[in-house]
Amino acid sequence: MLKPLGDRVIVEVVEEEEQTVGGIVLANNAKQKPQTGKVVAVGEGALTPEGKRLPMAVKVGDTVLYDKYAGSEVKYEGQDYLVLHEKDIMAIA
């Protein structure tokens, strides 16, 4: 598994539904980037100028909401992940 550094978090992408509630099937280009994911790895936290580690607010297993343009997409062992800074996470569900 990937090990994030600093205040980074690795999130497993949760795909959006391909069909709307009304039954309309969305084309791939009509779907927006997913905004929900499951935390699979957490860094040790950011360092302060004094060298102290700031604790992370999220933990492995949390479901998080993030901005649709946040993070860097990576593919690792056939699975899609996002690498986010903790500040890019808007909420824990």
UniProtKB/Swiss-Prot annotation:
The keyword Chloroplast does not apply. InterPro entries: Chaperonin_GroES, Chaperonin_GroES_sf, Chaprnonin_Cpn10_CS, GroES-like_sf. Keywords: Chaperone, Cytoplasm. It is found in: Cytoplasm. Transmembrane segments: none annotated. GO terms for biological process: chaperone cofactor-dependent protein refolding. The keyword Cytoplasm applies. Pfam families: Cpn10. It comes from the Bacteria. One of its GO terms (molecular function) is unfolded protein binding. GO terms for cellular component: cytoplasm. Coiled coil: none annotated. Together with the chaperonin GroEL, plays an essential role in assisting protein folding. The GroEL-GroES system forms a nano-cage that allows encapsulation of the non-native substrate proteins and provides a physical environment optimized to promote and accelerate protein folding. GroES binds to the apical surface of the GroEL ring, thereby capping the opening of the GroEL channel. Belongs to the GroES chaperonin family. Heptamer of 7 subunits arranged in a ring. Interacts with the chaperonin GroEL. This is Co-chaperonin GroES. It comes from Lacticaseibacillus paracasei (strain ATCC 334 / BCRC 17002 / CCUG 31169 / CIP 107868 / KCTC 3260 / NRRL B-441) (Lactobacillus paracasei). The lineage of its organism: Bacteria, Bacillati, Bacillota, Bacilli, Lactobacillales.
